[in-house]
Amino acid sequence: MTQGRFVPERGDIVKMSFDPQSGHEQAGLRPALVVSPALYNRASSLALLCPITSRAKGYPFEVALPDGLAVSGVVLVDQIRSLDWRARKAKLVGRAPTPVVREVLARLEPLVT
């Protein structure tokens, strides 16, 4: 898939810049899990993303990625951000298994309901 036609979809793992950041927010070029649907992402050029870190701390809003993916670490569900994936030149690096995506959405629910 060429970058010009790429539209992130729920479950994709992308790499993009999280700068600028403030306080306890994740920063820098890093992988992230896309949680918003492709229809929204295409129409708005925005996507809801949860950053991924290689440093697990055992927090309740961390969801571990299984071994064997292009990216390892934990999804930081409570650090969800809405970012312009086109302007930040998001690059597809992998895909999370469906059970991981479901777990991320389940842990996100109490934060937004």
Model-derived regions, located:
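Conserved functional hotspots at enzyme active or ligand-binding sites that engage polyanionic ligands
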Residues: 1-113
